[in-house]
Amino acid sequence: MQSRFLISPTLIRTFAHHANLTPRKILHDLPEAAHARKQIPLRPGVILVKKGMTNAWDEKTGMQVPLTILQFDRVQAIDVRTKEKHGYYAVQVGSGIRKPKSITKAEQGNFFSHNIYPKMHVREFRVRDASGLVSPGTIFTTDYFKPKQYVDVKGITKGKGFAGVMKRWGFSGGNASHGASLSHRTPGSTGQNTTPSRVLPGRKMAGHMGHRSRTVKNLLVWAVDADLECILVKGSIPGPNKSAVYVTDTINRSTSATN
């Protein structure tokens, strides 16, 4: 049975770009268009501060539930990106506070042009269309999230420094005795012989462990506390306490309260 598409839409647009031709628009029913729509949330995300963990008891099951505390720290919309001017829709969001003398003149102009005090953390969040844009200066509060909705949280994991293969990758190591000498925690063989005469890419070795961007998806918002300006999210989140994390509506349509 022949395939429906002999050439992918991406290749068609690439060839059209180099040949100075008008590229064919992505049809609404193509898998590529559906994938692009699914990967971008309707609303922009926010930058929150991880304060630590606590627990609660589920009244229905009687089980203890681990919760992570995420606090709003002067989260505010700074600028917007439009498809007409920039080629995509996005909202620039900032949180915290920073001294003006510690940032560049260009950054100062970006903040002061919207009458916003400089922020410690700044990040762009893509949105699906113009309906998700937020006017600059808008302050995000705990009302932005509702209990029982699901979110995706991205953070920087804790740095562990230089680690060996046993700690970094879970290698079993060599024998503790019976002839083993100076090779108890070594990685062992790292490749073949004359062929291919090199170490293949992706080989697990010792190196820097941690301090990587990781995303935890489909976390349940357990509760919202407007007085303390924080939300409680079920489960753990990467990163140390007092670190900034990026919270967005989950892209999973079946579990999102807004999609």
UniProtKB/Swiss-Prot annotation:
The GO molecular function terms of this record are: structural constituent of ribosome
InterPro entries according to UniProt: Ribosomal_uL3, Ribosomal_uL3_bac/org-type, Ribosomal_uL3_CS, Transl_B-barrel_sf
Keyword Cytoplasm recorded: yes
Per the record, the domain of life is Eukaryota
Under Gene3D superfamilies, the record lists: 3.30.160.810, Translation factors
Which residue ranges have biased composition labelled Polar residues?
176-197
Question: Where are the bilayer-spanning segments?
Answer: none
Please give the Pfam families that the UniProt record associates with this protein.
Ribosomal_L3
Q: Where is the transit peptide?
A: 1-15
One GO cellular component assignment for this chain's record is:
mitochondrial large ribosomal subunit
Q: Which UniProt keywords apply?
A: Cytoplasm, Mitochondrion, Ribonucleoprotein, Ribosomal protein, Transit peptide
Which locations, inside or outside the cell, does it occupy? Answer: Cytoplasm; Mitochondrion
The protein's role, per its UniProt record = Component of the mitochondrial ribosome (mitoribosome), a dedicated translation machinery responsible for the synthesis of mitochondrial genome-encoded proteins, including at least some of the essential transmembrane subunits of the mitochondrial respiratory chain. The mitoribosomes are attached to the mitochondrial inner membrane and translation products are cotranslationally integrated into the membrane.
Which family does the similarity line name? Belongs to the universal ribosomal protein uL3 family.
Q: Mind telling me which NCBIfam families this protein's record contains? A: L3_bact
Assembly and oligomerization = Component of the mitochondrial large ribosomal subunit (mt-LSU). Mature yeast 74S mitochondrial ribosomes consist of a small (37S) and a large (54S) subunit. The 37S small subunit contains a 15S ribosomal RNA (15S mt-rRNA) and at least 32 different proteins. The 54S large subunit contains a 21S rRNA (21S mt-rRNA) and at least 45 different proteins.
Q: Which HAMAP family match?
A: Ribosomal_uL3_B
Name by which UniProt lists this protein:
Large ribosomal subunit protein uL3m
